[in-house]
Amino acid sequence: MNPAAPTATLPSTQQRRLALILFNVCVGQFIVGLDQRALLVALPTLTQTFNTSLTTIQWVLLIYDLLLIGTVITVGRLGDLFGRRRFYASGFLIFVLSSALCGIAQTAAQIILFRGLQAIGGAMISANGRAIASVAFPASQRGKAMGFASMAFHVGFLTGPTLGGFLIDTIGWRWIFFINLPIGIWGAYLALRLLEESKEEVKGVSVDFPGAILLMLTCSLFIFAMNEMPHVGWRDPLVSGTLILSALALALFVFVELRSAMPILSFSLFRIRLFTASMFSLFFITSTQSAISFLMPFYLQDVLRFSPTQMGWIIIANSAVIVLVAPIAGWLSDRMGSRLLCTIGSAIIVIGQFFIASLPIDASIWRIIAPLLLIGLGWAIFNSPNQSAILGSVPRDEVGTASGMNTTTARTGGAMGVALSATLFTYGLSAAGMSRAQIESPQSWGDAPEIFVHSFNHTVHVVNFFTILSVLFSVVRGPRREIRQR
C-alpha cells in the first residue's frame, strides 16, 4: 500500500504532507478493521468459554454497533467544531484502554461492557479520520484517497481472521484484544506528531446529545424486541411493549432533530438526491453483509468442524479481493461517478450471497470461497465510490457530520442485520423442532447439521432481499453532476 499515490500530481511539499495524513488515517482504519474481523472468528470460542447463548454473545457485536450509532455523529460534529486531530488521537487512546480491559475480562457481561467503551474510541477514529482525509484532499483526488482508506480498513479485515484464528489456537482468545495495544499507541503518536489541527470556524453552536441518546435508544429497544420475538412471539407484552417504546423513541427523536439548532442528523442533507440514495444503498448492503458475517463462523466451526485458524483463512477471501480492487474503484469513481459502479457492485453481491444461501452440510472449501470472492469483488466496487459520493455531495462544514452519518448508517444496518439474522435463524431452528435450551446452546448445533444448514440457508435468502434494494437505490441515485464540491 502506497499512501502517496493519490497525491502524485501535486507539488512535492504538498504531496509529502498529504501522504503523511493519509498514512495516519490508514493506520486508524486498519486497527478498526483488524479488531472487528478478528472478533468474528472468536465468537464460537467466546460462546464456549463463557458458556453462554447466541442471544447473549451477539451483544459483543451489537453493543459496539449501538454505541457507535449513538456517538459517531456526535464525535464527528465535535471534531468539526473543536478539532478533528484532538478527537482522532483521543480515539486511539480510548481504543487501547478498552482493548486491554476486554483482554482481561472474566465474564461475558464484562466483555460486552468493555466493548461498549471500545466503540466510543472506534467512533472517534472512524468519523474524524475520514473527515481529516476528505478535507485535506482536493475534490479531484478525494475518491482515490477514500479508496486507500478503504483498502487499509480491509487490510485489517484481511489480517484479522487469520491472525485472530492463529492467536486463538496458540495463545488464547484474549490476544485478539491485546494485539491492538501497540498499533493503537503508534496511531496516537502519529496523529499527535504528524497532523495539524483541523476544524470549522463556526460560533454559537451546540451538540445534539439528546438526539444521540434517542437514536441509540430507538435501535436498542427494537433489537431487544427482535431478540425476544422468536422465543415468546410478537404478542408477548414484553415484546409488544418494547416495540411501542421503540416507536415512541423514534418519534421523539424526529421531533427533537427537527427543532435542534445542531441536529445529529442534518435532515437538510437528505434533500440531496445523491446523498440520500447513497445512504440507503449503504444501509441495506451492510445489513446483509453483517448478517452473513455473524452466522458464517458458526457454520464453519459447528457444522464443518473447522478450527479458528482454518476459519480465518476462509473468511479472508472477500477481504483479499477488496484490498486489491478498492483503490481501482475509487480511481474510477473520480472519473465516472458512483451510479454505475455501485449498481454493478451491489448486483455482484446479490449473486455471491445467493450461492452462500445454497451451501450444503458438506460443502467443499472452494464452494465456500468462490461466493466469498464474489461478495468481496462486489463490495470493493461499491464501497469506495459510495463513500466518495456521500462525502463529496455535502457542504465543507458538514463533512464531519456526513462522515459520522456514513458510519452510523453502516453500523445501524449492521446491527439490524445481526439482530434480524439471529431472529430468522432462531425461528428456523425452532420451527424444525429444536427446544429453546438447544437453540441457546450453540455447542449442540453440530449434532443436528441438517437443521442448522436449512435455517442458515433460509436466513441468507431472506436477508439477500435487502441487497436487491441496495441495487435499486444505486440505480436511482442520479448522475455524477449532482456531487457538490465545496
Model-derived segments and spans:
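C-terminal membrane-cytosol helix-exit motif in multi-pass small-molecule transporters
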Residues: 181-200, 216-228, 245-260, 470-480
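A membrane-interface helix-boundary motif in multi-pass transporters
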Residues: 169-181, 228-239, 307, 426-464
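Intrinsic disorder in cytosolic terminal tails and internal cytosolic loops
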Residues: 1-17, 201, 444-447, 477-486
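Transmembrane-helix bundle of Major Facilitator Superfamily
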Residues: 2-193, 325-329, 336, 340, ...
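Hydrophobic alpha-helical interface/terminus motif in multipass membrane transporters
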Residues: 43-46, 132-133, 167, 195, ...
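Flexible interhelical linker loops that connect adjacent transmembrane helices
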Residues: 12, 188-216, 258-273, 334, ...
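12-transmembrane solute porter fold
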Residues: 20-27, 34, 39-41, 210, ...
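Small-residue (Gly/Pro/Ala) motifs that create kinks and tight helix-helix packing interfaces
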Residues: 43, 156-168, 222, 297, ...
